[in-house]
Each structure stands twice: as C-alpha cells, then as structure tokens.
Amino acid sequence: MLSRHINYFLAVAEHGSFTRAASALHVSQPALSQQIRQLEESLGVPLFDRSGRTIRLTDAGEVWRQYASRALQELGAGKRAIHDVADLTRGSLRIAVTPTFTSYFIGPLMADFYARYPSITLQLQEMSQEKIEDMLCRDELDVGIAFAPVHSPELEAIPLLTESLALVVAQHHPLAVHEQVALSRLHDEKLVLLSAEFATREQIDHYCEKAGLHPQVVIEANSISAVLELIRRTSLSTLLPAAIATQHDGLKAISLAPPLLERTAVLLRRKNSWQTAAAKAFLHMALDKCAVVGGNESR
C-alpha cells in the first residue's frame, strides 16, 4: 500500500464520485478506479458501495477513513520533520488568521519574520475561526491566530494578548475630540459593522445584548478595509480593536466606559504534533511582538 492509495481513497470519499475525485486529483478515472480496486484487494474488503447512483462508503470504508486520515497527517508531518532545519535556512510555514488581526498585528509580524528568516516560505490566509480550527485539525495549517475560547479539544491555545474594542470614528466626527465616552452613547450612533460571518461581529452582538444595548447598524460589510473606508468618508462609526485605528490615517479610537468587550487573542496549534523550527520561531516572535503591542496599548 502506498500513500497514493490513501490520497485516492480519501478523495473519492470526499467527493462521492470517481469522476469528480479524478478531476480533483488530475488523473484519469480508469486509473483512479484501478488504484481503489488494488487498495480494496489488499485490505480484503470493499470500501465503497457502487450499487447506487452515488458512491458511498461501506461500513468498513467509514472505519478505514478515520485511520487513513490520521496516517496521511502523520506522513505529512514526517516529511516536514525530515526537511526541517534547525538553523532556519529553509522550510515553510502555513498560517491562518481571523481578519481583524491582519492590519495591526499580522502584517508587522510577518514583515519582521521575513526580515529575520528570508529563506522560510510563508503561506498566509484569512478565514473564519471555525475554518482555522478545522484546517488545523486536518493538518492543513501549522499555526492559527484567533480568539479564546477554542472549540476543538485537539488544539492547544497559547495566549498572545488581550485587546479591547473601541468606538472608531473619522477625525472629523463630532466625538473625535473625546478620548473616552460612555457605553450608552452607542444608542445614538449609526454604525458600520462587519457582517455576521466574522467572530468580531458575533462577539459584538452578544455583548450588546448582554449590556441591553441596541445600536443602529445601518451598513454591514464583509471586509475590514470597506468598513474603514466608509468610516473615513462619512459621519458613521464602528466597533473594532483600538489598535486598528492607530495603523490608519484619519481615524480615531475612542475607549468605552465601561468597556464593551475585552477578548484574548491566542495562537492555535495541534496538540502533540511535530512543531517545525519555523513554527517555534514564529511563536516566539509572536509573543515578543505581543509584549510590544500590549505595552503600547497600555500607554
């Protein structure tokens, strides 16, 4: 049995079709079918029920799928371990973050990491926390940055920093003369907020309901840059981490009293998994960067 057999089996199981799996794998359907038959012969059981209009896993196939997935993860980890170099003269790092971190934290962190380790290939993606956790568990990422609490028991969460949400307005907004306003002022503000798929929006809605607040949400946007551009050009306001405003000209972050929401950012990685030298270096640099960010926010 070869790793190719495992890859082919998992592809057919995922797509529920030899045709779609063959297309995804860039192989011919007859070649794929032959490899699956070889696998079934080596195991001595049929893995797929081919009697219906769609391909379905047999009971034996369902059981073997769990072991096949874990085996593929271990093979991938082993390959990375072989190519891992402790002096960081080569290697790769797969990172995913929730979108609010990109402008004020991940951008500077990635720039510093690249400057120190230019031979490390970096892959950075923005996505929801749910997807980050899922991809980490499937060994499709090395590290993720999101928020506590973490839902998957397979993941370790290392605290990075605690951030507060602030009322962010344009410099020409009437409230921009204030450093702090009462939380109750949100009743009077017309807000631009991130859309519901963002963890930040989910947290805002939860805490507003808990505090008995009913802000006027007049625009929803599915990107941070769109929200910030609308704030710059209008008299609307938004709720975002205060640090984001410091990275963009023409914006002012106003603290709320009492604070609407404080949340802990965490670095996520799989428990008991091989950590490459690049992943370890990234963690140490992230912790150092967070100490600087936290110090700036406290002033």
Curated annotation (Swiss-Prot):
Positively regulates the cynTSX operon, and negatively regulates its own transcription. Binds specifically to the cynR-cynTSX intergenic region. It comes from the Bacteria. Gene3D superfamilies: 3.40.190.290, Winged helix-like DNA-binding domain superfamily/Winged helix DNA-binding domain (1.10.10.10). Keywords: Activator, Cytoplasm, DNA-binding, Repressor, Transcription, Transcription regulation. Induction: Negatively autoregulated. Residues 1-58 form the HTH lysR-type domain. It comes from Escherichia coli (strain K12). Residues 18-37 bind DNA. Pfam families: HTH_1, LysR_substrate. This is HTH-type transcriptional regulator CynR. One of its GO terms (biological process) is regulation of DNA-templated transcription. The keyword Cytoplasm applies. It is found in: Cytoplasm. InterPro entries: CynR_PBP2, HTH-type_LysR_regulators, LysR_subst-bd, Tscrpt_reg_HTH_LysR, WH-like_DNA-bd_sf, WH_DNA-bd_sf. Coiled coil: none annotated. GO terms for cellular component: cytoplasm; protein-DNA complex.
